[in-house]
């Protein structure tokens, strides 16, 4: 094992012991926010320390076997050689596992998210494709046991959506869907096309992590303009009787959010504020990372909305993810929600890139 990696592991062990002591202090237990943060960090370190313990136990077993290999007894030496071989193989496997555990965690991996789909070039056909994408993500969410809630929607004239915003909640939602941000291109023959010509349209997808209730983005109520209006769409007669829908404008930035998914104006306001907070935090993070352009253009892409990440070719039943040059002729399966055929290779590529960076430290 490289000395730099061993040093990192020892520092993590020291931190693990430090947190253990802090959690036992009465002052920590009385501070709920600090206690929760330390508990999360402790839980993240637990698998690393457990694996490190296994690694060091195996190192000790290897040292003992090498000592035995110097014995005068031939039978003992042969047994020791076999133990040496097994211990070395275990050490290699454990080191690989430790390197994966050392990869920096995405601070948003435990969060829920907002998924925004907007029709781009292509008019009605782009709006229809936005509807296809929403159904794909809804089926994918169902496969993983996540909950998908519609926050706001603007329907297309011929179906689909000009824009649709949803909230997806559930374990692992962000870690799997975070690679979906970008431009999604579709190539197919529209139903209205009499000549059979293939048209190209596009939609943009933005995936934003939902901030915690105690997030560090502070919104000044004086900087908000709140408008109410009557909700449109499904919902029975109720939507025509009360101004339950909410539109909030953040005056300093011009960011506008709407929510009309709930019958309660209070609930719609809370949802809209949460979405506004997510957008403002995303903008803040983008500004902070503007100087790290090269890092943001790793193999899985930067996630910029303008970046074309994927092409859906209906005549050929083909889907191509341009970030990792992966082409699959399983378009229908993926549109039915089997998105892991793309997500897993993206996650693997991202992890490989992180491991390469770790090895270069």
Curated annotation (Swiss-Prot):
One of its GO terms (molecular function) is translation release factor activity, codon specific. Methylated by PrmC. Methylation increases the termination efficiency of RF1. Residues 285-306 are annotated as: Disordered. Coiled coil: none annotated. GO terms for cellular component: cytoplasm. SMART domains: PCRF (SM00937). It is found in: Cytoplasm. The modification N5-methylglutamine is found at residue 237. This is Peptide chain release factor 1.
């Amino acid at each position: 094992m490289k000395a730099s990696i061993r040093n990192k592991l020892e520092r993590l062990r020291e931190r693990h012991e430090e947190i253990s002591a802090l959690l036992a202090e009465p002052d920590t237990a009385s501070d709920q926010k600090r206690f929760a943060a330390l508990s999360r960090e402790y839980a993240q370190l637990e698998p690393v320390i457990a694996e490190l313990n296994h690694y060091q136990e195996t190192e000790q077993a290897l040292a003992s076997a090498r000592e035995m290999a110097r014995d005068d007894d031939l039978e003992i030496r042969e047994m020791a050689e076999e133990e040496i071989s097994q211990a070395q193989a275990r050490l290699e496997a454990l080191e690989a596992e430790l390197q994966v555990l050392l990869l920096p965690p995405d601070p948003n991996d435990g969060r829920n998210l907002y998924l925004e789909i907007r029709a781009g070039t292509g008019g009605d056909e782009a709006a229809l494709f936005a509807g296809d994408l929403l159904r794909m993500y809804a089926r994918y969410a169902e496969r993983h046991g996540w909950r998908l809630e519609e926050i706001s929607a603007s329907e297309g004239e011929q179906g689909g959506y000009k824009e649709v915003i949803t909230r997806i909640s559930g374990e692992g939602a962000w870690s799997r869907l975070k690679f979906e941000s970008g431009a999604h291109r579709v190539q197919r023959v529209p139903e209205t096309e009499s000549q059979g010509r293939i048209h190209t349209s596009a939609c943009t997808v933005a995936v934003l992590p939902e901030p915690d209730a105690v997030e560090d983005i502070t919104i000044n109520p004086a900087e908000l303009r709140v408008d109410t209006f009557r909700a449109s769409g499904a919902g029975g007669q109720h939507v025509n009787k009360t101004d339950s829908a909410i539109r909030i404008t953040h005056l300093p930035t011009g960011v506008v959010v709407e929510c009309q998914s709930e019958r309660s104006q209070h609930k719609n306001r809370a949802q809209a504020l949460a979405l506004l907070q997510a957008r403002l935090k995303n903008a803040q993070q983008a500004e902070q990372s503007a100087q790290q352009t090269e890092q943001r253009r790793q193999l899985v892409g930067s996630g910029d909305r303008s970046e074309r990440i994927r092409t859906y070719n209906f005549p050929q039943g083909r889907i191509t993810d341009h970030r990792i040059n992966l082409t699959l002729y399983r378009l229908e399966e993926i549109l039915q929600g089997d998105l892991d055929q793309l997500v897993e290779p993206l996650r693997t590529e991202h992890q490989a890139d992180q491991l390469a960076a770790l090895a270069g430290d």
